[in-house]
UniProtKB/Swiss-Prot annotation:
HAMAP family: RimP (MF_01077). One of its GO terms (cellular component) is cytosol. Its main location: cytoplasm. The keyword Cytoplasm applies. Required for maturation of 30S ribosomal subunits. Belongs to the RimP family. CDD domains: YlxS_C. It is found in: Cytoplasm. Keywords: Cytoplasm, Ribosome biogenesis. This is Ribosome maturation factor RimP. SUPFAM superfamilies: YhbC-like, C-terminal domain, YhbC-like, N-terminal domain. One of its GO terms (biological process) is ribosomal small subunit assembly.
Length: 151
């Protein structure tokens, strides 16, 4: 996490804790000629536009006070979306019993992608039920875990 992302995380936490929101991720990156500071938040039952506005206004004021960014940027506060990658222990716990797709850095049995029911998360490993068989994956080899969205 960059220095700007760390500062943003520290600045936004009080309003998130006060409202029982969860910080999912902070991104600070350049796209084209513009810099973006993106803050992704969530809560039980989902984030509303009013929630995003509340956090955005609070964070904008705090960033203006501290002024950690010496050029113009666009601040975005939003929900991470349905198919967002699972990143936090809370994400994994919320998705226990649900179908997920796991992408690996190094192949296992010549495969880098596995889909199955998320049975367990311990912090350093996850266990999936894939095609009737339990499979264990070390988190250090896991590149990405995303929920499988069925319509």
């Amino acid at each position: 996490m960059s220095r700007i992302e760390e500062i943003t995380k520290e600045l936004v936490m009080p309003i998130l804790e006060e409202n029982n929101f969860e910080l999912v991720d902070v991104e600070y990156k350049k796209e084209g000629k513009h810099w973006y500071l993106r803050v992704y938040i969530d809560k039980e039952g989902g984030i509303t536009l009013d929630d995003c506005q509340l956090v955005s206004e609070y964070l904008s004021d705090r960033l203006d006070e501290v002024d950690p960014i010496d050029h113009s940027y666009i601040l975005e506060v939003s929900s991470p979306g349905l198919d967002r990658p699972l990143k936090t222990p809370r994400d994994f716990k919320r998705n226990l019993g649900k179908e997920v797709e796991v992408s690996l850095y190094q192949p296992i049995d010549k495969r880098k992608k596995f889909t199955g029911e998320l049975l367990e998360f311990t912090g350093d490993k996850i266990i999936l039920l894939c095609e009737g068989e339990k499979r264990e994956f070390e988190m250090k080899n896991v590149r990405l875990v995303k929920p499988v969205i069925k319509f």
